Amino acid sequence: MVSYYLMILVGAVLVNNFVLSRFLGCCPFLGVSKKIETALGMSGAVVFVMTVAAAVTWCLDHWLLAPNGLGYIHTLAFILVIAALVQFIDIAMKRFVPPLHAALGIFLPLITTNCAVLGAAEINCRQGTGFCESVFFSFAAAVGFGFALVIFSGIREKLAHANPPRCFRGIALALVTGGLLSLAFMGFSGLVKLPY
């Protein structure tokens, strides 16, 4: 049992990383990765939202939508659940951590439309896994998102002191760096075989 959950963790963080393998959540990956502090704050917010959203959306889908034949509106219901969770985090951060709230800026409310969060809920719905597996997979996927975001922001902080050619400055260098990071993570492919 423990080895199965360890496989889910390794698979979601390294092998099938949401950002670097599935290309989900690229907007905050590029937008919040200029400083490690903001990347850590965004990672924490995404871990919380994705984990709680997985629990709530699993219950919603299995206890309300599927039994009543309302599966066709599950995406809309999932978006509403995610939006409510993001509002909760936004209010809590504004109250308790104002500097981090200001640093994240517009990207915090954009977690609502972060396709990684919605993607995790959709994957859990389609795979038909149990409650604990779904929540743990979403937690591991969020940790993988945060892991990639922090690594990428560390690289971008170092590159801020470099003097690249003019055509590579800004987002161009960030995209090339993200592509190289994605290639590096391809080295983990085949490490774990998961149904996700």
Regions found by a protein language model. Give the residues of each.
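Interfacial loop-to-transmembrane junctions
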Residues: 157-176
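Generic transmembrane alpha-helix signature in multi-pass membrane proteins
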Residues: 23-31, 90-96, 107-108, 115-128
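Ordered, amphipathic secondary-structure segments that act as subunit-interaction surfaces
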Residues: 62-105
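Juxtamembrane boundary at the C-terminal end of a transmembrane helix
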Residues: 4, 183-196
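Structural signature of hydrophobic alpha-helical transmembrane segments
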Residues: 4-19, 69-84, 136-148
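Small-residue-rich segments of transmembrane alpha-helices in multi-pass membrane proteins
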Residues: 45-55, 105-120, 170-182
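Juxtamembrane transmembrane-helix termini in multi-pass membrane transport proteins
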Residues: 10-43
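Mid-bilayer segments of alpha-helical transmembrane spans in multi-pass integral membrane proteins
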Residues: 80-88, 107, 111-123, 142-150
